[in-house]
Design a protein with these regions (language model features):
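Beta-strand cores of secreted/periplasmic/IMS beta-sandwich domains, seen most often
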Residues: 26-27, 63-92, 129-143
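Bacterial N-terminal signal peptides that target proteins for export
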Residues: 1-9
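Bacterial N-terminal signal peptides
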Residues: 8-18
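Sec/Tat signal peptide C-region and signal peptidase I cleavage site
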Residues: 19-24
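Extracellular/periplasmic metallocenter environments
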Residues: 29, 34-36, 82-83, 118-162
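N-terminal edge beta-strand
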Residues: 25-72
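The feature marks short-to-medium sequence segments in extracytoplasmic or secretory-pathway proteins
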Residues: 86-122
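Short solvent-exposed loop/turn micro-motifs enriched in small/polar/acidic residues
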Residues: 58-59, 68, 113-114, 124-126, ...
């Protein structure tokens, strides 16, 4: 208490507030959406696909903010679908110009080869989940790897600055 009285309560509060924000993880809100299970799923909308036209996407991810600082990042994920299970996987893009490795027969990304950094898996409609990971600076891709969803455009770019 002597230290607080010497510094003044206002100064002590500023120091405490500054200290707590240094240790806090960046928080990212992720909404997983689609236009309904009865909507036809287009293909050819995977990241870095030639002639990519995202206006055809019937599902996707809304990410806010899309840029954070390196360190601990907490993703708060909500499946806003009314009838479809979705997930969110964090992938590091070693080369942002290259597509992720894909298993055609399974209609999904090869998570082991792609550099999976963590996931909130299989969220039922209306459900939420969270994931906290330590991310280094670079480009990342958030994807839903339920078969067919990634190829239908269910992904979002994400940047981590130094």
């Amino acid at each position: 208490m002597n230290t607080i009285s010497k510094l003044g309560i206002g100064t002590a509060m500023l120091i405490a507030a500054g200290t707590s924000s240094v240790w806090a993880a960046s928080r990212v809100q992720v909404s997983l959406w689609d236009k309904g299970a009865s909507t036809e799923m287009p293909m050819g909308l995977a990241y870095a696909a030639p002639g990519l036209d995202m206006t055809k996407a019937t599902m996707g991810m809304k990410v806010s903010p899309g840029v954070v600082k390196a360190g601990k990042v907490t993703f708060k994920v909500k499946n806003d679908s009314k009838d479809t299970v979705h997930e969110m996987i964090v992938m590091f893009l070693a080369d942002p110009k290259k597509p992720l490795p894909y298993i055609d027969a399974e209609n999904r990304v090869d998570e082991d080869k792609a550099g999976d950094k963590g996931e909130v898996s299989e969220l039922d409609p209306g459900k939420s989940g969270s994931l906290t990971v330590d991310l280094k600076a670079g480009k990342y891709l958030l994807i839903c790897n339920v078969p067919g969803h990634y190829g239908a455009g269910m992904w979002a770019e994400f940047t981590v600055n130094p």
